[in-house]
Amino acid sequence: MSGVTHRGGDLRSYLSSVACFLTLILAGRVTAQTFAVLHNFSATSSDSYTNWDGAQPYQTGLVLSGTSLYGTTLYGGVNGRGTVFSVNTNGNDFTVLHTFSASQSPDYTNLDGEYPQGGLVLLGDTLYGTTLNGGTNSGGYGTLFSLGTNGTGFTAIQSFDSIPNGSNPNGGLVVSGNKIYGTTQESGATNGFGTVFSVNTDGTGLEVLHTFTVTTTNYPYANEDGGEPDSGLILSGDTLYGTAQFIGPYANGTIFSIKTNGADFTVLHTFTAGIGPYNTNADGAFPRAALVLSCGTLYGTASFGGDYDKGVLFSVSTNGSDFKVLHAFTDLDGGRFNLDGAFPTAPLLLLGNTLYGTANVGGVGGNGTVFSLNTGGSGFTVLHSFAATSFGTNSDGMYPECTLALSGNTLYGTTEQGGAYGNGTVFSLFIPPQLTIIPSGPDVILTWPTNYAGFTLQSTTNLGPSAVWTTNSAGPLVVNGQNAVTNSISGTQTFFRLSQ
């Protein structure tokens, strides 16, 4: 090793410039990811689908606050209608914060709702969420609820009524000040297929900002704006961005924006028609997840469509221009197995220039994957492939239909099924640092993030079984949040790794 000084200029400014204009090259092999199951949801009774802790955290992400994770299960609990739970990031202290009650025939009503499917959002010490069904209005069209992070103060702050306010709030919420914004999947009008709404955090002032309606009353339905939004919204300034999973001009869904006062509803992208018996297309179909936003670009997932009708990852500018497919998931062998996963139904997580996400099925075990890729579409990497199941159970879970949460260098998520009892898991996945190489004249600069304690740079000239790895003797220079070591290029091929 030759020290840490870049030849021919200031290293700090050089790293700043190459981070913007060069594609970094992965160097060697980094430490393997560490996967852990934090909680296995317990077995349920065969007749009433009840248990003590909940079952099947379906299409729900975890909310992270300090060392506590908060989430929901669609089923289970003592009434079989779902739960709100908390668990520490080390897997300890799993607590049921609320168990939803069963609705009553013939009008399917209850006081608190049932089947929470849209996940939670945290404001201070208060959690907000939605239930797919139940509530006090006849028909049981779902609720909006709040409760404290300690499980106290549960309140159903709104019961949906189908018309005009919509029904079945299935997506996540976004909170800004004293306002909550969300979507309902159904109704809102006679020919309605869902709404965008706002409501005060105390449940007052419910307002429909937009109703998705169809121009044809028979299937296949058609319109310009889409329908049945299955996802939450994101907020930037006074503009909300979201997806509608179905309908639109080609019946494959849309991406839209709308002002928080309900003005200026705009379709940013219409997903194109499928071709042939497998419904393949160029841009994807059925976007079921919320978007993420960075520097004027939206990133998201479409659960179907693409080259093999197995879903895509995409980006698009906030004005609707420059739509790009970042990754099209590959075909499945035997209807289940591939290398990268298939049918992504959850939002992406953005950290710097890296996107993290989950694919619902596929992978080498056939039960889904956790993946990462760069925002430009390069570097797609499977971080974890969920294991095959035997009679519905396995070691790590199956069907990860979840938004990932990140704390430090660890991702947290849920699986809908699988695990020790077949009812899903809460998991963690440690992500090791990425070692990168920047060519610099006669040298190479090796960098890795400074927030990874205990990792050292090692090198070898032989990758065989007898390889001897030598720890770099010179300490790295810290530049722009990166450890940086400069190494002179010699005639001998050298391999590098990070070791802990």
Please name every model-derived segment.
Residues 2-443:
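Extracellular beta-propeller repeat domains
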Residues 5-9, 13-15, 431-500:
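Short, composition-biased motifs enriched in small/polar/acidic residues
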